[in-house]
């Protein structure tokens, strides 16, 4: 079976076919999570989001109670929240999202360098998930 595949692969290469390359997605890691002892019913969650060159997040919204402060750790991030125009943020800059916001664009603005940010959520203890991707058009 292995030898039978070799001529097929060679034919595909000769005809100019190339293997499909899946675009890398962002990587999200929880840095910490803790109940806020002086604010009953609230918790703080910090996540790092790392984008390979050219990577982007799907349009999404966050938990309804989530206030989010984002700080760009490295690279350049393009972000569009709600109906505001998209903005570019560089390492050392920050932005925030109000509860209930729709995050239309969140992506690495560079196709050559990676980018990362720290997102700090203040959210109701029982509210979740933190992020929900929009449904694709035509899906149910």
Where are these regions (language model features)?
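Bacterial N-terminal signal peptides
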Residues: 7-16
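A short glycine-rich, His/Asp/Glu-containing loop-to-beta-strand
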Residues: 25-59, 65, 120
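Ligand-binding loop in jelly-roll beta-barrel domains
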Residues: 78, 85-86, 100-127
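Short, low-complexity, Pro/Ser/Thr/Gly-rich segments in the mature regions of secreted, periplasmic
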Residues: 130-140
